[in-house]
Structures are given as structure tokens and as C-alpha cells.
Amino acid sequence: MQHAAHSDFEEVKNIFYQYKDIFPHIRTDYLMRQIEGGHCIYKDGIVITYNFYKRPQPIGTVIAGKFHCILHQIVKDSTKDTSASSVLKEFFEYARADVWLSVRRDNVVAKKFYEKNGMKLVGECSWAAETLPGDVYLYQRTRSLSNEL
């Protein structure tokens, strides 16, 4: 997988700025830490930020396992005609673990994209003192008896 380098920072930042309505909370220092930490994929105008859990971690009504992957953000440069699906599928192979993410419940376009790429709706979550509802999706590579809280 192709990770972002320091020299990619401005391009990565500008891609996120295209989606300020969806990612108003993304700060430039966060993006720099993701790049410096090796947790930012940048390929063909697609950016994925992620991490791996060191211990079981609750995500809303479900629990991600130790060493599972959390996909924080995936964004596509709106000026490029590239396939986010192909980069996401390549990321699933790279991660070699269950991949989790949370998404705003009203983000129908993103949810259809995740489902089209093999992710399943497995739980619920919320932000902003439970005023902003969300859903939890999982791309499951491992067998598990239960991931519910």
C-alpha cells in the first residue's frame, strides 16, 4: 500500500478541505500526525487514515477486537476520476484484519459505498452528546463468536 509522505501533506489536506461539510473536525496537525505515524494511505487521489487497536475497543454498541483495524476516514479527490473501491479493497488486503468504521447515519452515499464493498452494518454509535446518530460497519476477515457489547 502506498502511504502518504511529508511531501504529500498539502495534497492530502486539500482533499479533506473539499469535504469540510462532512469532516469539519479534521485538523491539519491531526493529518500530519497520521502521515508521520504511517497511518495515512494516499493512492490515486484517495486518502485513508487508520490505526490498529492495541486492546479490545468499544465502538458504540459493538466491540472491535485487539489488533483489529479502525478506518478513521476515507476521502476521494473530487477532481480525479479514480476508483475509491479499488483502493479500499486493496486496503482491506493490506490490513489483514477486521476493519471497522463509524459513519453518520444520514450519510447515505457513504453507507451504500461501504455495503457495495463488502462491509456490513453491525452496530450503532453517536457523537455530540448522543445528538448525532451513527452506524458502525465491519469488513470481517476473522471468525468471531460475538462482537456485541
Question: Each PLM stretch: what is its role?
Answer:
Residues 91-95, 110:
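Short hydrophobic clusters on alpha-helical segments that form packing/core surfaces
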Residues 94-105:
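Conserved GNAT acetyl-CoA-binding A-motif
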Residues 1-7, 145-149:
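Conserved N-terminal entry element of GNAT/NAT acetyltransferase domains
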Residues 68, 104-108, 116, 124-149:
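C-terminal "cap" of GNAT-fold acetyltransferases
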